[in-house]
């Protein structure tokens, strides 16, 4: 097939940008709508922004399940296509859609039943709890849009149709940006309006992605009649994707615990947690392009692994690490030079500026190391070694970051230097880069180096 041949024969530099650029553009649009969403909410009140910020760990946990499952589907499908196994590729795709539906049901039930307890575990401010409940119950209760959208976009990406996935994601983001001010300000619905605008955008993107897969993606055949779950395929999907789910979920746990540390020990309490939430919104403009690059490279590595093209695999991994590091260094420079300007977008108060400016400058020091970690983590996922990514993520965010942040917060509280807590991020990133390099060295020695350089037909 033409798209298969593109993954296997197009020059690596050209192929990386051919695959990644549409995803990068769509993810930048996604980052824009994430920020616009929070900006509009911040114009209602700081309490509204705090509610949405405290909802982030639960919302991200849901997206972790959806995206991590899709990672497993994408990698497994890429290998099947690389090995010319069309039937297996189709089976993987259909089981991926089944898992997306199961994930929606699970998150819907959890969101509708546990939302109140989740917010009360973080704060005792009743206004924040009530607004947070309104937001989270809607976003999780109607999450079939985001589950379907992410899975179907990965099917498009995995078959070389990255430009089509850009259309679907961009459509959802633009609809959300248009509807946000209408629901929040015209209809005076506040955070509830933000949640409704979000799910409408996700549902529209889901429907559009389904149509594109059925009409414009001949490499995958979606046949719903007579479908039965294939538990062996599902097991293989999660053998690859579950570490990715857990890895991203670890980020939710980290954010939840970090919010607890800030609210308890930082002198600014909820305002410090809100500033931390703003940082996460802003850093998406830096990290989203790198994740887009990574998502474009994963099917390249997976396909060439299936085709036993070692030279192309290594070149793709090396180039992606270089490009990712360049993006992250640029992002670090922006955070160092313009932190106040970035925070003022969210109508930051003087207290939030005093907390947020040093936070952005200190945390962003970790960016220059994160690029290589993300790029090499993508190669782990593509080659079915997501456990390495999981190990790195757990070490960085739970084993190191949270304990170090807890200790530094205690020291900062007693010494009157609240800014100490933010140094936990660059400290943890230094160690995670070292662990990532060790894992990649092991992967290269045990797996990559054993493949023929240019395919099995060239083995002497």
Predicted segment positions?
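Short loop-to-helix capping motifs
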Residues: 125, 161-162, 190, 269, ...
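Short runs within selected transmembrane alpha-helices of multi-pass transporters and secretion channels
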Residues: 70, 139-157, 165-173, 194-207, ...
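Short alpha-helical transmembrane segments in multi-pass integral membrane proteins
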Residues: 1-20, 77-144, 186-242, 301-366, ...
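Transmembrane alpha-helical segments of integral membrane proteins
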Residues: 374, 400-411
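Small-residue-rich hydrophobic transmembrane alpha-helices
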Residues: 49-109, 146-165, 275-333, 337-339, ...
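Transmembrane alpha-helix boundary and packing residues in multipass membrane permease domains
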Residues: 23, 27, 39, 75, ...
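Hydrophobic transmembrane alpha-helices of multi-pass small-molecule transporters
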Residues: 61-64, 176-180, 206-210, 285-288, ...
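Transmembrane helix-bundle signature of multi-pass secondary active exporters and lipid flippases
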Residues: 23-75, 139-146, 235, 239-304, ...
